Amino acid sequence: MGVVDLNERIVRYGDLVPCRTAFIDAHTPGSDRKENFTIIGGGVSESADQHVHITDTPGFNIGAAGQPPKCRNSLHAHRTAEVFFVLSGRWRFFWGAKGDDGEVVLEEGDVINIPTGIFRGFENIGTDYGMIMAVLGGDDSGGGVVWAPQVIEDARDHGLVLGENGALYDTKRGAELPEGVGPMPQLTAEEMKQFPKVTAAEFVPNFVARYWDIMAMADGAPAQVIAGDGMLADTPGFRLELLRDGSVSTDRYTTARHEVLMV
């Protein structure tokens, strides 16, 4: 790979392009100030305005969410893995069909591997703008977001409708669902009952890794944060490691696998 090719695969923080209309809750008060970034792959954005920095997907997608204080991301579920690394700020993650099954607060450097198939949301509870990096499993990130019914209802009250084609339509700007395209069906009460309940006692020890614990495990070798034999034992189609000074040799090497470095 030449230098030109490599430069095309570098995304710098200062060049990130946010989308403020990425999801169905973009007009809902309390969620209307968040920013979505798609860095590698299109992720699960529902907006035609979303800028994708690197379109190639190596079996997973990488993005980010940026939010000011007291801004939240509404309850939703995914069909593949969703992992967050807190880049900046203080964040509360909550889960459950109504968001009240449990919660945990994460600080800078912490990692959370949210169990696939449960509803989750998160909010910035810090005092400044914060950002969390996200890794979504699969080339298509599982085919889109599954929203809790109340999120769809709240969005409709504020002019946004999600079509069954996965696209957003802003009725306050005169947009309508295209002919032959219906609204995204809401989950029924019976379907909602099929989602598992996970207590904080089950969640936190198995799906949260704290920064200083990760740093300690990176002494002399990369910390295996998410792997079959990692701190968070899982095989979601990618591995997550943390490197620090002395974790790896400075010798050149090659690998047959895709490798993404976040500095």
Task: Give residue spans per PLM region.
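A short hydrophobic beta-strand segment most commonly corresponding to one strand
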Residues: 83-85, 113, 127-146
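Short, conserved beta-strand element in jelly-roll/cupin
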Residues: 59, 64-69, 77-97, 135-137, ...
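Short histidine-centered beta-strand/loop micro-motifs
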Residues: 50-55, 72-78, 95, 103-104, ...
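Intrinsically disordered, low-complexity, charge-dense segments enriched in Lys/Arg
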Residues: 140-152, 158-175, 235
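Short acidic-glycine-tyrosine-enriched beta hairpin
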Residues: 97-116
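A generic "binding-loop/recognition-motif" signal
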Residues: 71, 79-80, 118-119, 128
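Histidine-centered metal-chelating micro-motifs
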Residues: 72-74, 92, 111-112, 116-122
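A short, N-terminal "cap"/entry segment at the start of jelly-roll beta-barrel domains
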Residues: 1-58, 164-252
